[in-house]
């Protein structure tokens, strides 16, 4: 994690060096970014400030990502490293927001599952899960709620059945809803 944290520090410093955020340095310094970045273009993975400006939204449109092609280009560990780096970037951004606002800034993670093939290869989900577990250990105060949008019907029924069995600390951070996000611009900063 030290390597990812240092890379994140360097990337954020470069991304903000001219007084406004420039994403290119963050993407260029991402571990395995040369193999991964193209799969996340076009609004498939986005970081946004929330409406209040006191936290971040990290949105993943999983159904729009060609996970089979992505996972043929990288290993689960490489993708997990990439996602962990993204968490380190979010930690740096939340730290700056916290200093500015005087309150703890967190990241709300939004997973849009529209179009996700639950019966396909689990490698992509395994990489997300590995990065999430490591990220929660390295950045314990960073995670805010997790919003799962557009769950496939069967999964939605199972989640409703098993959610009461989750610990209260987990249930407090989960949100489920059906919401058509439309095109990638639906989560742009112009739309709020």
List the predicted regions and their residue ranges.
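Basic, amphipathic alpha-helical/coil surface patches used to engage anionic, phosphate-bearing ligands
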Residues: 1-192
